[in-house]
């Protein structure tokens, strides 16, 4: 086991604070509408330009092990806030730095770190309640667009696009962000259920120009296993031909004789047919086939439940208004399923989302719910260069998360004003002892840090701006850093989601409190590598 370095007390906290400052100073230049960009070097390809706090934080790794520990703890604040709220990472970093700085001073002055932490926790609880009580619920598309615009750094086009997407797919719909091939950013909404599997053979195509298969009012056979022979299916195929409607087969795979027979029948015009592989893998595939069956009013043909292909009738097949099949995607439009069954299935998936502990599973379940209940929208982000597209994509991601958070928990005035005003809730607060009172005071000072930093990044004096904002009693009165004016922030559309502000403060206080109470640090001692031996002389060389 390698030897360890151990640092204690003030020495440990000083090293840690140095790391915190390096990371926080790099992140906080991005805060606010006039925040600057940070350029990140990449081991291959062009450098990446970003204004996203968490992307900057994730890139920072320091040479000194003890400084790095401090930096990584603050990085954790940014990551946690990003995971929960999806935005507010820079605000969380600024708050954490302010709490740790003030806390370190108090500990150096001889105060009890545990009491300081208790005071910080109590004050944060009161501030969170104050934020919740001053929250305004948002409902109109205009307000949703305002939240998106603020988070996208003042780009109205992005805000409006997100509001439009949310309107079309509903609160349970899925909105994804992708890179576009062209210059323009566009919104693409998929109506109906789409999954990422296309036709098994290009011979099923009905539109050779676009290479797609479009089938109107088809029957849908949902089969769990592989189809290699059509013999068991012949009675069913006869019934489908007599009905005069197309047939879509969704199965694990269709190959061999079965595929050849279907293709020949399609080419001769005897049967309008297409075959698609089932989406997903393993248990998730079973669940997705069940979703398709409920959406289309059909049954999954599976030997597990005792249904064999020979005994399948037309009543067991699903139906839809239209199915559109591309090389890599299939879309089912207006499935003929019973609406009560679909609602029941949605409630079942919602219950699974509540219970699951895995982020990956939760994401997949939400996708399934969206396909059944809402819809899927894709925002394709365009730009002139790859660097620009990546930078815009970061901002669209942030804006999307902020908008979702705003719909979920409501909004408060933006620009760091809500946190600064929440400090008034701490005025009459009583603590058990003086050290805890100082903990409350640390939070009160830290609450002004985001407002001061936004003003500083806009070229103003942070202390003067904070003083002027707090002099005015109006809750929505604040500083518009973009225009350099004092105004009613909510009316001007400068708003923050309550969830983002709350999460940023709670995460910052959690890590800040832990760092203040640190008394010792242990890190591996770097090994001194011996210099390489000089190469020996070659034979016949005159040394």
Swiss-Prot record:
Enzyme class: isomerase
Keywords tagged on the record: ATP-binding, Chaperone, Cytoplasm, Isomerase, Nucleotide-binding
Family: Belongs to the chaperonin (HSP60) family.
Gene Ontology process terms (BP): protein refolding
Catalytic reaction annotation: ATP + H2O + a folded polypeptide = ADP + phosphate + an unfolded polypeptide
Official protein name in the record: Chaperonin GroEL
Aminoacyl-tRNA synthetase recorded as keyword: no
Cross-referenced SUPFAM superfamilies: GroEL apical domain-like, GroEL equatorial domain-like, GroEL-intermediate domain like
Disulphide-bridged cysteine pairs: none
Signal peptide range in chain numbering: none
Gene3D superfamilies registered for this protein in UniProt: GroEL, GroEL-like equatorial domain, TCP-1-like chaperonin intermediate domain
Gene Ontology, cellular component aspect: cytoplasm
Protein residues bound to ATP: 30-33, 51, 87-91, 415, 496
PROSITE patterns in alphabetical order: CHAPERONINS_CPN60 (PS00296)
Organism: Gluconobacter oxydans (strain 621H)
Chief place of localization: cytoplasm
Domain of life according to the entry: Bacteria
CDD domains: GroEL
Listed InterPro entries: Chaperonin_Cpn60_CS, Cpn60/GroEL, Cpn60/GroEL/TCP-1, GroEL-like_apical_dom_sf, GROEL-like_equatorial_sf, TCP-1-like_intermed_sf
Assembly information from the UniProt record: Forms a cylinder of 14 subunits composed of two heptameric rings stacked back-to-back. Interacts with the co-chaperonin GroES.
Function: Together with its co-chaperonin GroES, plays an essential role in assisting protein folding. The GroEL-GroES system forms a nano-cage that allows encapsulation of the non-native substrate proteins and provides a physical environment optimized to promote and accelerate protein folding.
GO molecular function, one term: unfolded protein binding
Subcellular location: Cytoplasm
